[in-house]
Structures are given as structure tokens and as C-alpha cells.
């Protein structure tokens, strides 16, 4: 594996620019509409809108929009040709002006961004309604991932080979740049998750991620299978032993000289999960390329923190393994010893994520951080209880609630879940300290959280985020969220770190 390894292919997003005035040679101007009285649309905006369009031009645009039935309803897209020496207009509805918030603006701009195939240069005044939200929506909504199809293949998505530039007219430069960094972070997480396991496996993943982090001055360290064995990382080794592509542990470190707090990030990095000896059904197993979504989120988050120069020390600990059945695979009935000495009885090899997280969380706890956040596509029970779009957040009460509330505030749905004490009896083993699953079909998400709690150091504020559903969208695109990798919950974690840094 070359030390210079990079992702074999990256997704494409629009180039976002901040301009003081309307550039020349614009293909279209994107405007926003509110729903007015009697369902008649109203142009949304003020100074920026007036800087581009005269009152006469605005009236002509509204007449055209009304003529083709535009109402200004949320996420409604309407196109009209240019009038009064104005470029063609693409209008997106925002609904009621009184009910507009950042998430509605993100979803609307994401929706319109997905509709701009075939355009090369567009300008927009929507930034004056909320620049950060608009940049996020346009950036993430414009994302496309061609994958490894050959150039010029007829199967390529329409417009994917025609780059789009979006010009925001006016706004604060610092806010614009910070929003771009967040977009870049989500895109990196999406690209990592979308990369097939043939190309992203523990060894390559560790090198690719380390190279990405090194570009922004982060300290990197990679432990191979021999070092993992020497240091006693029994969970990572057990899960990865069935594969010919051996496990790795990646450590990334960001330090700020004025920081007073230390945050540990841990992300599940199972680059492909067959279930091991407890083999998964074949249907939809291809989606298991996403089983490293938690690790991708943490890698992207710590890089964004460095780029934003956040005044907080951060260490990301990323266990990476491929869970495969073979003559060398771990088995139900095995007992493994984790980093730090706790032992686990294996009842199901498809509950592997918590085993590698346990090692990583025990190591992260040795650094005595103030906060520990882990993220993982961990349980099917998360999908059953909260669905495809809402993460389950567990942990110490106050910090758990903070992370869940922050997620909702940035538009990444999250809900605080309990860790009932009675589950402790169900994760006890007669032959080890713990068992990796219970004998009950109930409370699977909480039981996994209760298991992980055993590996969190005393006095550490902790949040465990189960993203089994939200990390990978198997349904249709919506708002600024594409099909396949979503990049959740990167924006949540960036905001949590910003809040900690500013205290």
C-alpha cells in the first residue's frame, strides 16, 4: 500500500463562490419564493434581490411565475425564461415567511441544487436569508458520486460531467468559508462511505485517512495487526482475523495551544460486514460498505475542526476491520480479551461493531478526555425504533441530551434514548465479564449502549450515537440528502465541538 494513497474517486459538488455583484455570463438566477396571500408567490429577499433586479424586472418575473402556477410552497421548483434583460430564473419555494428556519432553507436550496443538471454558472440571492444554511444546502444538494464507471459511459448520471458553479451575491466572508469547510467535511464522509470495499479496506482506509488528515497538520499514527496483538486489542483482532485484509487502528490528533478541553472521538470502521460466522442474509448485503460510516464521520469531523482552528484538543481513535467468515474467523462461544483487560463472550459474530469500539474506547479513555463521543452504524434495533433518518443518542444524561439537541438544531435528526440499569444483568456472561449480545430480542440498541458504557473511563462525559439508518440513504434523495452515503452526523459533531471550544 502506497503511503501516498488517496481515494480512487471523489464525489462532485458545485463550486461555491462569494461575489459582490452579479457576474457576467450567468446561465440562470436562483431566487426564493414565499407563499403570499391567496397562494400567490412573493419574491423572498431584500438588498441582494434589489441589487440584481429592478422593481420592474421583479414584477415581470412574478407575473411569469404566477402564469405557470408557482405558489411558493416549500421545495417547489419553477423555471421561467428570462424577461426584461434578465437571465432565466429558477425559483424555489420556501413556504410561509413566518415559518422559515435554517433547516427549511437548507432543504429548499438542496432541492433546487439537485434540479440544476445542465447548468454551468448560476447566481443566487438566497444567501441573504441565511448564508450558512444556503451554502450548506447548495453544496450538499449538488453532490453526485459517479463511482468507478469509465469516463463517457452512457450509464453516467445526467449532468454529472458538467461542473456547476454557484455564485452567492453578497454576504460575510468568514461565515461563507466556515460553511464551505463544513460542506467539505460532509462530502469527505460521503466519499469514504461510498467507496467500495474492494478499494477501501483496513490497510488502504488507514493510509487514505491519514493522508487526508496530514494535509491539515494533524498528527497521525497507524497500528498494524502485529502492534495490535502486542498491545492487546483483542476485539479488533477477533473481528478482523477472518479476513485476509488485516485490521488497523488509526489515531488522529488535533491540538490547539489555547485549548482547555479535550474531546475523544471514536468511530466504528468495519469496512465490510458479512456478519462473519453468524452470516447475514444475502439480500442487500452490498449496503454493508456503509458499516464504516461512524469512522468516516469522525475522520471528517476532526479534519474540519483543524481547518476551523477550533480551540479544543481532539483525538480520534478509529478501529478498522473487515468482518469475514473463514477458517480463521472468530466464533460464537469464543471469549476475547479487550484492550484494558475486560473480557467478552461472543454469542453472535454479527454484533462485531461493539467489539472493536470497546477496544478503541478503552484506549481513548486512557487519555482522560473531558468528553468522549462515539458513532457507529451499530444496531438494526435503531432502525426499528427510530427509522431511517433519526439517530439514537445514549450516554451520560446531560451530554447525551446536548448532542441530541444539537443534532436537531443543525437539521440532523437525533433523539435521546435511555440506558436502563436492568440491562446490566442481560449483558453479564457466566464465562466472561460481558457477553456481546443479550438473549432477548428487546432493547437491542440500548443493550449495545449499555455494553459500550463498560469501556468509558470514570468521570468522562459520554455520548454514543447509533447511526445505522441515517448514515446511508437506501430510499430516494430528499432535500440536500442524496441516495447512498449521507455524511450524517458530521454537522452535529462539528457544532458540538464548536460549542465546547467557545465555552
From Swiss-Prot:
Molecular function per GO: manganese ion binding; metalloaminopeptidase activity
Free-text remark on how the cofactor is bound: Binds 2 manganese ions per subunit.
Catalysed reactions, as listed in the record: Release of an N-terminal amino acid, Xaa-|-Yaa-, in which Xaa is preferably Leu, but may be other amino acids including Pro although not Arg or Lys, and Yaa may be Pro. Amino acid amides and methyl esters are also readily hydrolyzed, but rates on arylamides are exceedingly low; Release of an N-terminal amino acid, preferentially leucine, but not glutamic or aspartic acids
Localization of this protein: Cytoplasm
Keywords: Aminopeptidase, Cytoplasm, Hydrolase, Manganese, Metal-binding, Protease
Active site feature: 280, 354
Protein function: Presumably involved in the processing and regular turnover of intracellular proteins. Catalyzes the removal of unsubstituted N-terminal amino acids from various peptides.
Name of the molecule in the record: Probable cytosol aminopeptidase
Organism from which the protein derives: Corynebacterium efficiens (strain DSM 44549 / YS-314 / AJ 12310 / JCM 11189 / NBRC 100395)
